[in-house]
Each structure stands twice: as C-alpha cells, then as structure tokens.
From Swiss-Prot:
Keywords: Repeat
InterPro entries, per the entry: CRAL-TRIO_dom, CRAL-TRIO_dom_sf, Spectrin_SESTD1
Spectrin repeat placement: 272-378, 381-494, 500-602
Protein name: SEC14 domain and spectrin repeat-containing protein 1-B
Annotated ranges, domain CRAL-TRIO: 1-153
Membrane spanning stretches: none
GO molecular function annotation: phosphatidylinositol-3,4-bisphosphate binding; phosphatidylinositol-3,5-bisphosphate binding; phosphatidylinositol-3-phosphate binding; phosphatidylinositol-4,5-bisphosphate binding; phosphatidylinositol-4-phosphate binding; phosphatidylinositol-5-phosphate binding
Gene: sestd1-b
Record Pfam families: CRAL_TRIO_2, Spectrin_SESTD1
Amino acid sequence: MDATVILPILKKKLAFLSGGKDRRSGLILTIPLCSDQTSMDELSVTLDYLLSIPSEKCKARGFTVIVDGRKSQWNVVKTVVLMLQNVVPAEVSLVCVVKPDEFWDKKVTHFCFWKEKDRLGFEVILVSGNKLTRYIEPNQLTEEFGGSLTYDHMDWLNKRLVFEKFTKESTSLLDELAVINNGSDKGSQNEKERSVDFNYLPSVDPETVLQTGHELLSELQQRRFNGSDGGVSWSPMDDELLAQPQVMKLLDSLREQYTRYQEVCRQRSKRTQLDEIQQKVMQVVSWLEGPGSEQLRTQWGIGDSIRASQALQQKHEEIESQHSEWFAVYVELNQQIAALLNAGDEEDLVELKTLQQRLSDVCYRQASQLEFRQNLLQIALEFHSVSQDLSQQLDGLLGMLCADVAPTDGATIQQTLKLLEEKLKSVDTGLQGLREKGQGLLDQITNQASWAYGKDVSTENKDNVDHIQGVMEDMQLRKQRCEDMVDVRRLKMLQMVQLFKCEEDAAQAVDWLNELLDALLKTHIRLGDDSQETKILLEKHRKFVDVAQSTYDYGRQLLQATVVLCQSLRCTSRSSGDTLPKLNRVWKQFTITSEERVQRLEMALAFHSNAEKILQECPDLGETVMDFEQFDEVEAVGKSLLDRLTVPD
C-alpha cells in the first residue's frame, strides 16, 4: 500500500511509529485517541500501513503499543485493543493503555485484560502517563508521555512520501533499464541494423531519480545521528523504518544499470550516427554518380560564339550550384567521420575509412570534372572573344581597303600607308593569338574524352574540333585576302605618291624656267668690252641655255610620267593640264630671248673683233691712212648692234 493512496488518513495521525524502542528493542507503536470520533476502519488502514514498514527482523522483536486513552472513552479504548488482536496479534508483545488521571468507572472497566491475555495473544496493562517510564526509557518516549524523543508527524509523512516515490521510481527504472540492457546484450548484432525506438528511452529520467535518491540518502544519514550531548536520538527515519540500506542498495543498482544503459545508449547513438552517416554518404554518392554525372554528360558543347559560350557558362554555374549543396554535405560528413575516427573505436574503423574513402573519391572526381568543364568553357570563351576581336579588326581593315582613296598630298598617303601596316600587323598578332587559343582548346577537347563515363563523345568532339578549325581557317583566309588587298592598295598609294611627286617636280621645273628666264632678262644684258669678254659671255650663255634645256626636258619627262601614272591609277592629274602649257610657254619665251641674246653676243663679238683688227693694223690713226672700206664695215656692224639693242627683249 502506498502512502499517497491513504494520504488523507495518514495526515490524521491516528497512529504513528515515533522511532522509539522498548527495552527489548521492539518498535513503539503509538495510537493517540484524541476523540470519540475515531474511525476504526481508518485506524485499521493506518495500522496495516505502519506495520508494513519495518523489516521482518524488526517485526520479530515485537511491538510495544501505546494506546493513549487519556482523552477518550473506555469503550473506544477497548475496541482498539480488541482490534489489535485482529490486526497484528503475532507482532504485538505489550499494549500499554494510558489511562486518564481520573480513572474510568469500575463498572465500565470491569473487563480484565490480564485475564484475556491468552485469548488476546499479548499483555495489556493500564498505566498512568507519568508511570509509563517504568516500561519504556524516557528517551524513547515522545514529549506527550514525558519523554525526550522528538517526532514531527508531517515531516515523517513527507519523507515517507519521498522514500516511497523514490522506491517506486527506482524499482520501475531498474526493471526498464534491465530490459533495455539485457535486450541490447542479446541482440547487439541486430541492433546495428535498427534505429532507436521508444524501448530505448526509460519512462523517467535516471539522472533525476539518482538525484532524488542521493538527496534522500543524505537526509537519512543526517537524521540518523542528530542527537545532543553525545547521545543518539532515534528518529522515525531510522534505517529500520525507511531501510537506509535499501536506499543505498537501490542507488548502487541504479548506478550500475545506468552506467550500462549509458554505454548502451552510447553504442546505439554511435551506431545510429554511423547509420545516418552511411545513409547520407550513399545519398551524396548516389546523386553525384546519378543526376550530377548525368548533368555533366549532357554538357559537351563549347558554343559557336561569345553569347553561346556565356550561356553554357551560366548553365554550368547552375550545375555547380547544385553540386555545391552536396559538397557542403560532404564536408560535414567528412568532419563527422573524422570525429568518429578520432574516437578510436576499432570495430568501426574499417567501415568508417571505407565510407570516407568512397565519399572522397566520388566528390573529388566530380569536383575535378566540374573544374575541367569550367576551364574548357573559359578557354572557349577566350577563343571566341579573340575570334570576334580579330573579325572586327578584319572588317575594319577591309572597310578601309574598300573605301575610295582621295588623298590630297603625299604626307596623307604616307600616314594612310602607316595606318594600313599597323592594322595588318595587329591582325597578324590577333591571328597568332587565335591559333594559340585554338590549339589550347583543341588540347582540352582531346582530354575531354577521359571524363566521358564510357560515353562515345567522338561526334561531339568532332563538331567542336571542326568548328575551331573552321574558325581559324576562315580567319586565315580573310587575313590573306586583306593582305592581298593591302599589297594592291600599297602599290596604288605608292603610285599616287609618285604622281604627286612628279606633279610637284614638274611645277618646280616651270618655276625654275621662270627663274632662268627672269635671270636672262634682268642680269644677262652685258655684251662685253672686248671680243675676249664677249666670247666668255657667249660661252656662259650656251651653258645657261643647256641648263634651261635640261630643266625643260626634265619637266617634260615628269609630265609624261604623270600621264602614265594617271592612266594606271585611272584618274585625272590635277596639274598636267595647266603645267604643260606653262612649261611650253615659258620655254618658248626663254628660247626666243635666248636666241636674241645669242645674236646680240655674236654681233658684239663681230664688232669687237673687227674693231680690234682695225686698231691692231692701224695703231696710229693720225699718221696712217685708214682703210675706209674696212672702217665702214665696222661702223655698219656697230650701228646694227645699236639698232638691235633698241629692240625690246
């Protein structure tokens, strides 16, 4: 019977075990009859409960029952005494009925207990409260009987409730732990293949029960020796009442079973963790080798333009994003496996290392494939970028070559030629870079077959290779056409430079002739003072005419060259129409002036020669008769020369 069931009755204190003992070490059971309203049924229940507490050894020493009838009537006392016969006749050795100071009427108490000893099974004595110490030591009596033993019924009841709760919970917990531990020992191998279920969890917390037990034991041990003056004061919490050894035994059993339970939980937790890790590892491996690998199997193209390559890169980033989630799980699993490996459980080392190795192999292989694909797409993007830049350069060069050339001077043509050469050099550099990128991309595509998972990628690779080679060949052909056009344009522009040079030089020849004519008119006027000087002037004039003739011939040749160049260039000369008439006009004027100059010099030479001859033959005019005919001839030449000089040049 639990105290909680009859708690309202126990609180009435109809009977109690104070913890005191008689001289035979038997326990003292006190029944305080406080009123005539005492329920015999409730008293019987109380006695049954109290007498179930002591151990069998304690019961064998017998009980001394104190029936306090000082505040009750005799018939109630008699009823209680007779009830003891029915409740515990074998355990009761002595019943002390404490009578009131004013004894009951003899008519009432005519019943003689001593005569009924054989029938009752125990001795009954009537005693005054102050005479009770004759049978029981004072320190074993409570204060209401003049003793020194302290008893707090509610305190005892509360401790009793705690004890019963602990006993009940600990006993139940021990049974549960035993079932769990024994079940684990019998089926440890099968447990590895099962997850934790409700049977592994006790109905109460073992830590809480142990804590309650330790607190209860501490209370018992503290109250076991709480007397004064070196004496021992027995309390209702004595080990014979609440079985302190029983609490200790329960605690020892609990600790043992709980330790085993903790080990079982640790093993099961480790097994569960290992199963979860294995399950997650298989999930990661299954996804990477399944959907993840399938995603990579479908991605073999490199695109045919920058936009196409960028679209493939974006698709690859989406694939990488999905993989990164599983790689994060891999990192977490790897840390968990490392922690379990560091725990040093030999039985799981091989399995853990196998899981770790397989997980690492799959993840690293998949990561390598992702990186390879990313590098391939990056190289493809660079290839298409270089190809596009080169195509734009070729388009610009072609546009420049197809445009009409209308330079105004040679410097502009030289600048244009320099720009063409620079563009052609840039195209050559771009084509070289395209070849390098293309070769690198071809090498990567060749290595791509190693990631094919057994898939025949020859078709995909052939398309990629054909595209790359086609782009490079197309760029080479375009570059060659541009080079040919540059050669033609270079020749044309050089001819234009030559044309401009011829036109400039022809104009310069006209200027030179004008300068020669101007010099002839302004500075070539002396005829000489004698024949010798005139001869010298005549010789200089002939050389002067030769220079003018050379200049005129040079100008004519330049103008003829411009005609040929214009025919070759299919253009009209800017100056040949004006320069040639100017050249001819200046040359004609120069020729007329030159001939006039020659005639004058020749007449002057004839005049000086005849005059000098006359003077040489007739040195003394006063004494010699002159040859008048010769003189007349000289005079005639002189007059003719004077007349010639009066004619404008």
